[in-house]
Amino acid sequence: MTKLQLKYRELKIISVIAASENISHAATVLGIAQANVSKYLADFESKVGLKVFDRTTRQLMLTPFGTALLPYINDMLDRNEQLNNFIADYKHEKRGRVTIYAPTGIITYLSKHVIDKIKDIGDITLSLKTCNLERNAFYEGVEFPDDCDVLISYAPPKDESLVASFITQYAVTAYASQRYLEKHPISRPDELEHHSCILIDSMMIDDANIWRFNVAGSKEVRDYRVKGNYVCDNTQSALELARNHLGIVFAPDKSVQSDLQDGTLVPCFQQPYEWWLDLVAIFRKREYQPWRVQYVLDEMLREIRHQLAQSQQLRPEQAAESED
């Protein structure tokens, strides 16, 4: 039996047509003329002697053969991409995809202040994805998504084989609007049980949160069970509810700087009742990382630590340790 000489472009065209179910859309995605797309498809079907798509309907539909064939085509395309990425990494070329996950607020910070400082990324595609902490992540560790290269998180990784590189510490405490506090005064964390608290899903235990505070003037940490009518899976949404006078929010001090300046939110306690969280970058060990990931990771962490040192959010000795 004569072996078929299958071309990469033919396989790519079939994959894109299957995803879009439209030759015109496929031509736009691929950047080639619609007539050429049709010709490549016809040549492939003639070569194998079987129809891949059914053209009797308004949309292109896969035939039974096409349905069975598509997984093999996509697998071959993926392997080709992996091979190209391997060669590029070996040659230290800047190409391929790097996927970064982080909570909503951190993704916003990276987009505003960090990514544009990584000037020379060549043909690397940076994919920024939101990953708010899941329930119990603070207590059990955070999951590392399958397609993730770097995860920036307030929680340690559940998988202990991953690296968690310290970036900085954030103080987390309780804030509310002035209107809320005028109606519902509070002075100590043990009074939180009598208040409407805006809960964070990743800190849920049953129908409540456990908020932690250092005892003022000491390193002792105490847990306080709080409840409320609202649950959010990210701090940004919780802050919006607090700005609308709906309760007390537990948030990093760096997330509320503008609110404190304009008086939208104020601290609930006069004494420094706080919980310090480590912000970490989680990634695979470097021997298992593609070079492009190492490059983006190093550039990103260097810029973050530079900004932290400049703003004196990070003590000089911590900044030095982090660079080692």
Curated annotation (Swiss-Prot):
Gene Ontology BP terms: regulation of DNA-templated transcription
Keywords: DNA-binding, Transcription, Transcription regulation
Domain HTH lysR-type: 6-63
GO MF annotations, alphabetized: DNA-binding transcription factor activity; sequence-specific DNA binding
Gene Ontology cellular-component terms listed: cytosol
SUPFAM superfamilies, sorted: Periplasmic binding protein-like II, Winged helix' DNA-binding domain
One family name in Pfam for this protein: LysR_substrate
Keyword DNA-binding: yes
InterPro entries named in the record: HTH-type_LysR_regulators, LysR_subst-bd, Tscrpt_reg_HTH_LysR, WH-like_DNA-bd_sf, WH_DNA-bd_sf
UniProt DNA-binding residue ranges: 23-42
PANTHER family cross-referenced by the UniProt entry: HTH-TYPE TRANSCRIPTIONAL REGULATOR YBHD, LYSR FAMILY TRANSCRIPTIONAL REGULATOR
Family: Belongs to the LysR transcriptional regulatory family.
Protein name (database record): Uncharacterized HTH-type transcriptional regulator YiaU
Native organism: Escherichia coli (strain K12)
Source taxonomy: Bacteria, Pseudomonadati, Pseudomonadota, Gammaproteobacteria, Enterobacterales
Gene: yiaU
